[in-house]
Amino acid sequence: MQFLSVIPEQVESAAQDLAGIRSALSASYAAAAGPTTAVVSAAEDEVSTAIASIFGAYGRQCQVLSAQASAFHDEFVNLLKTGATAYRNTEFANAQSNVLNAVNAPARSLLGHPSAAESVQNSAPTLGGGHSTVTAGLAAQAGRAVATVEQQAAAAVAPLPSAGAGLAQVVNGVVTAGQGSAAKLATALQSAAPWLAKSGGEFIVAGQSALTGVALLQPAVVGVVQAGGTFLTAGTSAATGLGLLTLAGVEFSQGVGNLALASGTAATGLGLLGSAGVQLFSPAFLLAVPTALGGVGSLAIAVVQLVQGVQHLSLVVPNVVAGIAALQTAGAQFAQGVNHTMLAAQLGAPGIAVLQTAGGHFAQGIGHLTTAGNAAVTVLIS
């Protein structure tokens, strides 16, 4: 192993640097674990949820790969530390052998025999069996340590290509799955785009038509309400006029009745006066005169009441006529409002039909988009 030169201190320093790098990487992965494994959905729809789950799955796979890399890194650092310790022990054994040789050589040249230490070693087989045995044991131990280090280093380096290939395969699989899902999602979006565009255009046209119908319906309803108010006002005015007409008719009837009663009283008085005139200044004549005069007074009162009733009737008739005219006007306005309402309903009906059709197309587009999102999620899961 003369071609191999190892400095244990530098190997231990490199192991410590690698451990520090691993600590920094572990802290970085731990800090990124929360935002990358639990990605918050941008919205509450199915597509946003599926996209968030895709990126969350990528984050979890990255954490799994990080854990595997951390385990390999720790094992590699431990192997470096073990190798440095083994080389240090081997160098110590070599130094001990050199010291023994340096001490025993002068003793052999001066005394002709080994030093006391070598004599003790030769006389005590249980302690090592002599200098040659000790050096041979140290050499064998150093060879075994070097071989152990080489084996451990080879065993540590051997999994690197396969681990790198496995990591590349996992990354390629993740990228391929993401590309396939993205391609399917893009295809689904392209397929759903015409439906969505068509549905959006139909929605706009239908909304404009429906808004036109609503705009026409609003003044029609206002006209109906106003006509209803005018109709109620005219009805109230007509009812008031009819009430006054009824009251005037009652007064007129009372006046006619009083006139008839007064005429009867006057006729009775005149009859009595005529019958009493035969006997002028007779007691019967004297009694008949007040009766005849009372009938004339009652007749005058009845005539006055009759005139008042006719006056009241003449005052009420214009109100009745105005109420009937207002009632006719209100009826015409009400009929016009009903016609406007029917026209607005007819204009709004096609808009509502188009709106329903656009809603169906939009629902179909959403269905296509949902199917595409489910397919993308299925590919990611598989």
From Swiss-Prot:
It is found in: Cell membrane. GO terms for cellular component: plasma membrane. InterPro entries: PE-PGRS_N (IPR000084). Residues 1-92 form the PE domain. It holds the Pfam family PE. Gene3D superfamilies: HP0062-like domain (1.10.287.850). This is Uncharacterized PE family protein PE23. It comes from Mycobacterium bovis (strain ATCC BAA-935 / AF2122/97).
